[in-house]
Amino acid sequence: MKVRASVKRICNNCKIIKRHGVVRVICKEPRHKQRQG
């Protein structure tokens, strides 16, 4: 899980979703998981 100021899609499987006001990237590649911090 990477915590960064600006979350971006890394590959085509990445999806940007908003959960409880937190922007997240979910992907089948675990290294692409991100959260806005």
Curated annotation (Swiss-Prot):
The UniProt entry's GO biological process terms, in alphabetical order, are:
translation
| Source organism, top-level taxon | Bacteria
DNA repair as a keyword of this entry, yes or no, is no
Keyword list (alphabetical) reads: Ribonucleoprotein, Ribosomal protein
- Under which name does UniProt file this protein? Large ribosomal subunit protein bL36
Any one GO cellular component localisation term in the record: ribonucleoprotein complex
- An MF annotation (GO) of this entry: structural constituent of ribosome
Name of a matching Pfam family:
Ribosomal_L36
Give the family per the record.
Answer: Belongs to the bacterial ribosomal protein bL36 family.
InterPro entries with a match to the protein in the record:
Ribosomal_bL36, Ribosomal_bL36_sp
Native source organism of the sequence: Vesicomyosocius okutanii subsp. Calyptogena okutanii (strain HA)
